[in-house]
Structures are given as C-alpha cells and as structure tokens.
C-alpha cells in the first residue's frame, strides 16, 4: 500500500485538516466520532490504508499529526473525535503571534523534535510511504515559519518521498493581520525549493464561492474549509479508490510539473451550486467540463485567461463514459488552444473514479498549472516590498533573530519564480533559475507508467 502521512499545522491547517477527515472518513464508511467502520462496500476498505491506520478490530485512525504552537485549537479536535491518536497531538506553550520568525526560530523550533519523532513513528508503521501532505496557511506565524522548518527537515530525512502542500495564501481584501505579506514572503524559499506539489488556495476566492455560487448569506470558515475538503477529496480520489487510473503522488507530479520549480497548482471543483440550482441542472459531463475551467469555480483568485496553462487535469467521479470525458477535455483544449502552451504535448489529463462524492451523482476536480499564477506572486511581492521600503513592523522579526537580508533574499526568490512562470509562457527553460529542488525526482516511480492523458447538500456543514 502506498501510504501518505499528513501534517496539519497551525490554526488554519488544523481546521482544513479536520474538514478533510470528516469528508473522507464518510466516503470510506468510517464514523468520524468513534473511528469505527460501518461501511457497506468492500471498495471502501480496499485502499483505506493510504490515509488511515487500521487495527485488528476495524478501528481506524487518521494517519495525521496535528501541530500548533498553542494548544487550544488541537485540544478541541482531540475532544471532538476518536479518529485522531492522542499521541499525535503536538502543541507548544505559546502562540507564534502571527510572526514567521517565532514560528521558525523560537516557538516553532521548540517543538520541532517532537514533530519529527511523531513523523518517524508514523513512517515506520507503514509498508511503503509515498509522501507527505502538509496543510497550512502562510499568513500566520505557525503555518509559515514552523511549516518551513518542518519541510526543510523532511526533505533532509526523507529525500525520496514527495511533499505535497495545500497552502492558504493571504488575500488583501480578507487580511486580518498586518504582517501577512511578510509571513507569506518568508515562506517562499521553502515552498519553491522543498515542496513538489503546492496547491494554492485563498480565502477571498473561497468566500466568493460561498456568496456568489452557493448563495450563503452568512458564510463562515466552516463552509470554506468544507469546500477545500471536497476538493482535496477529489484530488486524492485516485489514490484512495480503485478506478480507471490508480494514481500516486508521483504520477500527479510527473503529469503536472514540467520543471521542478513550476509546481504551484490551482485547484477547482464542480458542481459548486445550490441545492435548488442542482434540481434544474442537467447534470451532464459536458456541464462539469465547462464548469471546472470557469474562474468562479477555482479555489484561488486567478483568471486563467490572463496566462497559459502548462498542464491541466480533470478528475471525474461518478458513472460516465471515459471516451466522452476524453473527447470533451480534448475539445476544451482545441477550442482554447491559445490558452495552452504549445511546447508541452498531451498536456491535458483525465482520470475517472466510479464512486461519486456524498450527495452528488457526479463531480469533477480541476488541477491547473498556469502562468497566470504569476499575478498572485506579484501581488505578494508588491505588498511585502511596500512594507519593507518603510521598514514597517520589521523590528518584530529582527527582535526574534532574523536579519533584513533574509527578507531581500526571499524577495529575490519570489521574483525568480515570477520570472520562471513568465518565461515558461514563451517556452523557455524555466527549470534552473533561483534555487534547487531538494529531494526532487523528475521520473516516474519504478514499475509505474505515466498517467494516461486523460439528498444531503455537500456544501452544508450541519
């Protein structure tokens, strides 16, 4: 079995992680509160060990480590479910205070050894580890600083395994902390050089989905976390269930990442409509294919029309014709040929799993590697440069042991990744500038083929 170890870090990472375990535990027939199996299909158990540890008595535990520099968030999760192993809660004694420096140098560093010890124990309990899944925000101190520290250690200790990050990126219209641009900036080197797959999310796009698509009058973080969890469930479907394509993290990496540094991906999901709208929807594969390319269905505020797609993938769930899916996806590429780079052949992939998500007959998850993401990076760079020119709030970081040169180095790294994506739109080699790729491997795993080109409302948390 090709297992994945999850690390959910900081307040946002643990909230998203908890929603993810809610969603996939139900899909696998595991009761979230007790961890007991109550499913009805052997398919629910066939590949359950990818994300769950199983006992002889059919008791299941999430293969995850819950990490925060303060204990309050993860203590609530410990009390809410027996799905989590008590020994896998790692908490410090003091919050990182929305400060990358405290997450990286002081408060986060104080619990790093315990995090790595728990990780080692989880890794030793699996048969064949394929990689790590890290859930975090880069706007706060723990999610940015401690995650960067953890990633550096994981790459050093497990160089043959992939790191997959689900990252909540600060949005200027949703900012709650004045130093978020600094924290996001300082996270850049670790994400560029140590992550293999980085799925970019932002709260502004997610709240717009809640308000515009789902017509929720009082949307909260529980709603947006649920949308993220649905999308993560879609991305991991082919890892967790048998289907047309039994993919692994490495296959996703090989198919989606043309150069090691260009691994920042935009996820999307369809359908994202209200229950009433679903009643009037035809519910066709054609509709799903159209919707996953709409900016309104992306979990990051990116306009695909403002860049070119290097690679794209659609992961479909439900009973449908593989031939129809392939034809429709190929048709999208042919009709929008100018929105795809011409130097990567067969750069649109499909995968199908017969098992639909809860409450839907069919769904589709989008993954896009687009040069339009440079607009997001430029936004982060501009915000941090504006503050750094004035040396605004810099003393909060230098007081924790950081130097101003570290900010300048991070800005250079961020500018380099912007340049890499910009040049890739013209087909220039974007693989070498600005840094290495710790623990990277560009080839498929031995023995694996490259992936083939190819009632209850889901959005309510009650």
Curated annotation (Swiss-Prot):
One of its GO terms (biological process) is mitotic cell cycle. Residues 420-462 are annotated as: Disordered. Residues 430-441 have a biased composition (Gly residues). Keywords: Cytoplasm, Cytoskeleton, GTP-binding, Magnesium, Metal-binding, Microtubule, Nucleotide-binding. InterPro entries: Beta-tubulin_BS, Beta_tubulin, Tub_FtsZ_C, Tubulin, Tubulin/FtsZ-like_C, Tubulin/FtsZ_2-layer-sand-dom, Tubulin/FtsZ_GTPase_sf, Tubulin_C. Mg(2+) binds at residue 70. The keyword Translocase does not apply. It holds the Pfam family Tubulin. GO terms for molecular function: GTP binding; GTPase activity; metal ion binding; structural constituent of cytoskeleton. The keyword Cell division does not apply. SMART domains: Tubulin, Tubulin_C. It comes from the Eukaryota. GTP binds at residues 70, 137, 141-143, 203, 225. One of its GO terms (cellular component) is microtubule. Its cofactor is Mg(2+). It is found in: Cytoplasm, Cytoskeleton. Dimer of alpha and beta chains. A typical microtubule is a hollow water-filled tube with an outer diameter of 25 nm and an inner diameter of 15 nM. Alpha-beta heterodimers associate head-to-tail to form protofilaments running lengthwise along the microtubule wall with the beta-tubulin subunit facing the microtubule plus end conferring a structural polarity. Microtubules usually have 13 protofilaments but different protofilament numbers can be found in some organisms and specialized cells. Tubulin is the major constituent of microtubules, a cylinder consisting of laterally associated linear protofilaments composed of alpha- and beta-tubulin heterodimers. Microtubules grow by the addition of GTP-tubulin dimers to the microtubule end, where a stabilizing cap forms. Below the cap, tubulin dimers are in GDP-bound state, owing to GTPase activity of alpha-tubulin. Belongs to the tubulin family. This is beta-Tubulin at 65B.
């Amino acid at each position: 079995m090709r297992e994945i170890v999850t690390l959910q870090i900081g307040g946002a990472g643990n909230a998203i992680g908890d929603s993810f375990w809610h969603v996939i535990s139900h899909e696998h027939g595991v009761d979230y509160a007790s961890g007991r199996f109550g499913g009805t299909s052997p398919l629910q158990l066939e590949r359950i060990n990818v994300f769950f540890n199983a006992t002889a008595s059919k008791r299941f535990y999430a293969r995850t480590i819950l990490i925060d520099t303060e204990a309050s968030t993860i203590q609530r999760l410990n009390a809410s479910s027996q799905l989590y192993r008590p020994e896998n809660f790692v908490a410090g004694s003091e919050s990182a205070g929305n400060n990358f420096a405290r997450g990286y140098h002081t408060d986060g560093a104080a619990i790093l050894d315990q995090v790595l010890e728990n990780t080692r124990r989880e890794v030793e309990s699996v048969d064949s580890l394929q990689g790590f899944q890290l859930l975090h925000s880069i706007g706060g101190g723990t999610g940015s600083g401690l995650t960067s520290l953890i990633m550096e250690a994981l790459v050093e200790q497990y160089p043959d395994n992939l790191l997959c990050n689900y990252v909540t990126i600060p949005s200027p219209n949703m900012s709650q902390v004045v130093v978020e641009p600094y924290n996001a900036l300082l996270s850049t080197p670790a994400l560029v050089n140590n992550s293999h797959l980085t799925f970019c999310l932002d709260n502004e796009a997610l709240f717009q989905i809640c308000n515009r698509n789902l017509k929720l009058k009082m949307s909260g973080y529980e709603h947006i976390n649920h949308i993220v969890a649905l999308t993560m469930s879609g991305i991991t479907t082919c890892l967790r269930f048998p289907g047309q394509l039994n993919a692994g993290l490495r296959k996703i990496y090989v198919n989606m990442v043309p150069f090691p540094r260009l691994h920042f991906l935009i996820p999307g999901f369809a359908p994202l409509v209200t229950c009433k709208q679903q009643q009037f929807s035809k519910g066709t594969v054609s509709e799903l294919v159209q919707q996953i390319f709409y900016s309104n269905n992306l979990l990051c505020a990116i306009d695909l029309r403002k860049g070119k797609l290097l690679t794209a993938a659609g992961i479909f769930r439900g009973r449908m014709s593989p031939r129809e899916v392939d034809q429709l996806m190929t048709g999208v590429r042919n009709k929008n040929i100018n929105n795809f780079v011409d130097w990567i052949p067969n750069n649109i992939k499909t995968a199908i799993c017969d098992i639909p998500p809860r409450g839907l007959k069919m769904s589709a998850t989008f993954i896009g590697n687009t040069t339009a993401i440079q607009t997001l990076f430029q936004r982060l760079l501009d915000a941090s440069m504006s503050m750094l020119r004035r040396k605004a709030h810099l003393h909060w970081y230098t007081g924790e042991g950081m130097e101003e040169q570290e900010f300048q180095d991070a800005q250079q790294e961020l500018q380099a990744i912007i340049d890499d994506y910009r040049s890739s739109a013209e087909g220039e080699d974007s693989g070498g500038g600005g840094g290495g790729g710790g623990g990277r491997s560009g080839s498929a795993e031995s023995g694996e083929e490259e992936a083939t080109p190819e009632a209850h409302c889901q959005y309510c948390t009650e």
